[in-house]
Each structure stands twice: as C-alpha cells, then as structure tokens.
Amino acid sequence: MSAKINAKKLEMFDLLKQFIDSKQNLFFLDYRGLNVAQLTELRNKIEGEHGSLKVVKNNIMKMVLKEKNINVVDSCLVGPTVVVTALEEANVIAKIFYDFVKSSTLKVKGGFVLGEFYDEAKVQAYSKLPTKKESISLFASVLKAPVSKLARTLKALADVKN
C-alpha cells in the first residue's frame, strides 16, 4: 500500500512540476468556502485569459518549488491552496481573481511575478495596473494630444485671418 501512495505522490509531483514549468507568474489562493461551481467559474475565467488554475497539495508543492529553487513564504502554502499561473499578462489574471474575491470567500495568499515574490498587498496593487492594451491606448492618446492641440491652434489662426 505504501508503494501505491508513493507512486501516486510521485505522479502528482511530476504533474505539478510540469504545471509550473517555464511559468514566471504564479499566484497562491485560499479557496476555502468556494463550492465546485464557483471554482469552475473562476477556472473558466482564468483559462479564457491564457491562465491556468490547479488545486494543489501543499507539501508536494513545497517540494516542487524547492527543486526549482523558488523560495516561497510558508503562509502561502497553508490550508486549501490553488495555484494560478499566467502565460501572458499576469495582471489581467490577477484582476480576474480580485474581482472574484469581492463576491466570494476566495483569499489571495501571495505570488511570484517575473520571479519576484509578491505578498497579498503587492499582488493587489499589481492587479490594478493597466493591461498592455490599456497602456498602449493611453500612450497613443498622450502622443495624439499635442498634435490635436496644434491643429486646433492653426485652425483658430486661419479663422482669425479670414
């Protein structure tokens, strides 16, 4: 029986290792109090933005992180834990689960963004940053404003001369 358990744990270890392989953005959430439907809804929203969500066993996750030389605060791996990974824009994924936090018992424990540990407060601040699309749009409007102002000024001068 012990060999069966160890084989199962080894399989879980390998699956978790593959799950976080080459992912630079990881978030740890406490899903205590969520029902299956809520967890499925959260998973679907996250996967819709190129992220992944996986319920993990804390001890096995600790071993995987240790093997990958990732130091995580112990409080991130206590109690029921889901790990969320982001393939692209991590702050979009963070916005999704923070929107979910407002209407459920979901709690953010912390995470890693580009290899740097973020506590709950930092993850929340990170979730409020503009997305890549929003940043590009803002930058374009900043570039456009002086040109528009110049055009209005030249038009006003032309109107005055006529």
Swiss-Prot record:
Pfam families: Ribosomal_L10 (PF00466). Gene3D superfamilies: 3.30.70.1730, 6.10.250.2350. InterPro entries: Ribosomal_uL10, Ribosomal_uL10-like_sf, Ribosomal_uL10_bac, Ribosomal_uL10_bac_type, Ribosomal_uL10_CS_bac. Keywords: Ribonucleoprotein, Ribosomal protein, RNA-binding, rRNA-binding. One of its GO terms (molecular function) is large ribosomal subunit rRNA binding. The keyword Ribosomal protein applies. GO terms for cellular component: cytosol; large ribosomal subunit. It comes from the Bacteria. The keyword Repressor does not apply. GO terms for biological process: translation. Forms part of the ribosomal stalk, playing a central role in the interaction of the ribosome with GTP-bound translation factors. HAMAP family: Ribosomal_uL10. Part of the ribosomal stalk of the 50S ribosomal subunit. The N-terminus interacts with L11 and the large rRNA to form the base of the stalk. The C-terminus forms an elongated spine to which L12 dimers bind in a sequential fashion forming a multimeric L10(L12)X complex. Belongs to the universal ribosomal protein uL10 family. This is Large ribosomal subunit protein uL10. It comes from Borreliella burgdorferi (strain ATCC 35210 / DSM 4680 / CIP 102532 / B31) (Borrelia burgdorferi). The gene is rplJ.
